[in-house]
Structures are given as C-alpha cells and as structure tokens.
Amino acid sequence: MLKPLLSRAKLSCVPAIGYGTIRLLGHSIGIRVEGAQPVDALLAQGKRMIIAFWHAQQLMMPLAYRGSGAYVLISRHGDGELIHRIIARFGLQSVRGSSTRGGTEALRELIRLGRSGVDLVITPDGPKGPRQVAKMGVVQLAKATGLPIVPLAFGCSKKNSSRAGTGSSCPTRSRAVFSYGARPSLSRRRPGHPNWSRNGSSWRRRSTV
C-alpha cells in the first residue's frame, strides 16, 4: 500500500518542482540563442518542423521552443510520465513510445500529427542510446511528413548531471546557449543509416541518405 501512495505523491509533486526548477535555472543563468533566424523564418511563414536534440540535453529544452502546438515523443519507460507532466506545464503535448515499447504506434501517431500541421519534437538517440547516435526514426518521420528536421543543442560552461532520463545536463551558475544547426537535406532515395556527427550543435551529416 505504501508504494502506490509514494508513487502518486511523486507524480503529484515532482512535475511542479521540475517545472519550477527549469524556470528558475532559465532565469538565473545567461542563456543566449544562436542560429535561430531560419527557425523564426519558418514560423513566420506558418510552416512546421521536426525539432531534434540529443536525449542527454533534454532538461532545458522546453525553454527553447519558439512556436506553439508541439508534440514531444516521450518514452513509456521509467520517468516518462514525469517528463510528460512537466512539459505539459510548458504547454507541450506528448506522444508516448520508444524503440522497445510502442514505437511503431508512436511513429504512426507522429506522422498523423505532423501531416495535420503541428511541430514535432524528438530525441533521435532515444533513452536507451547509444548516446548521440541518431536512429532511423527521425529520418522516416521527416520523409513521411515532409517536415524539415531542425537540429537543436544545449550547452553550458558548467553543469551537473541530473537524472532526468539518461544524464541530462543541469546547469548551475553557468553561461549557456541554445544553438540551432543547419537543416540536413534528405534525398528521395531509400535512406541508409544516418551518420550524424557527435560534435556539439553542428550535427553535420557525414553520409548521404
């Protein structure tokens, strides 16, 4: 009996604490934004996009979203429900699924939503990793919806490791940056395995698909 009570208490309290912590960190550190002009141009034209960032950088990302009506892919595992409730406080909605649980259904739902005219948010390496190695889902999603992939990265001069998923970066007393990378170009040929660089915010493609 005690365990269910603690679980309910966790789901009730942690999202509010998480939301407040992210907001506080956002106000207390100097976060600058780089490379957002193409994103703002897309938004000004009423166009939608797929925002992609590494799983370990997810903690501060709700503060980076510049549009409205985004759906975020969140795992059904472990802390997924907590993340779902935290991002809901930022006005973001979620689709639940991962490569090991509900992935096919989640991909279908994301395709449907992307075609209906909303932004999509995905971590292409996922909670299970391998870290900073993009899986095929983001490429399949872009090809099926016609939406451009917009790479996003977060970096800070000092950071602690916070257990929000797999080691999210949690800045403390630091200078930080949200950096948007150039959109990768996808050909119409059957995609091979995407080979993204691990190097920070650039997300350069090193092989064609």
Per-segment meaning from a language model:
Residues 135-194:
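A cross-family acyltransferase "interaction/gating" segment
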Residues 1-67, 84-85, 175, 198, ...:
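Membrane-anchoring hydrophobic helices of lipid-metabolizing enzymes
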Residues 80-84, 105-112:
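Short, charged beta->alpha transition segments
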Residues 48-101, 161:
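Catalytic core of membrane glycerolipid acyltransferases/transacylases, capturing the structured
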Residues 93, 119, 148:
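Residue-level detector of anion-binding/catalytic polar loops
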Residues 109-141, 145, 203:
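Catalytic-site beta-strand/loop segments enriched in glycine and acidic/polar residues
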Residues 32, 100-104, 131:
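A conditional alpha-helix N-cap/helix-loop micro-motif detector
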Residues 97, 123, 151-154:
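Generic beta-sheet signal
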